[in-house]
Amino acid sequence: MSFSQEVIFKKIPKHLHQFIANQDYDLYYNARDQAVWRYVMRQLSHQLKSSAHPIYNEGLEKTGISIEKIPSIEEMNKCLSKLGWMAIVVDGFIPPQAFMELQELKVLAIALDMRSIEQILYTPAPDIVHESAGHAPMLYDTEYSVYLHRFGEIGVKAMFTKQDKEVYEAMRHLSIMKGYPSTTKEEIKQAEEGLNNKLNTVTILSESALLTRLHWWTVEY
């Protein structure tokens, strides 16, 4: 069975193709990226050895994630397929509705980018450390896997508003601005003000917004 990105791509509904990126592994990640990955993962492994759920450390290996190198999406899919899941790479934040639909399909969306050395301890934008090492290992836990899938089934049916869309776009813009090394403090300030303005215009919490909060409180944290 092939786990190439092209094969996985064809299994995804066409309207979601616009959000899928291509992981050209050898061209996209350089030696510095690999060094950052090793540093972050070794620190994480040391910190979580005694505090993480036992499933997590076992799940790293079971989902194709190594401490020594950035994971290849093909290698991850070979492992995830045994758990009934797949993974694709995406370019940063994608709309919550698209994210939930992928989750309903048991497809894990993983950010393509690798954080920079300047943002080695924390990155404001989604990156492959957070998306792969942060979420994939827990899929090895059957109850968590069922929960995540069910969340997607419910989330894809949730009603959302125009305000939700505007907040998402402002949040994505801010994360992009913070991710650019050349972005000025003034540009970040403007992006933050733009997001706050959109948040202040929200007059009602939609089903989608409430589910997003629950997702942050359970899946993200």
Where in the sequence are the language-model features?
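The feature captures two recurrent sequence modes
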Residues: M1-I188
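Extended, Lys/Arg-enriched charged tracts that mediate electrostatic binding to polyanionic substrates
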Residues: Y168, R172-S175, Y180-Y221
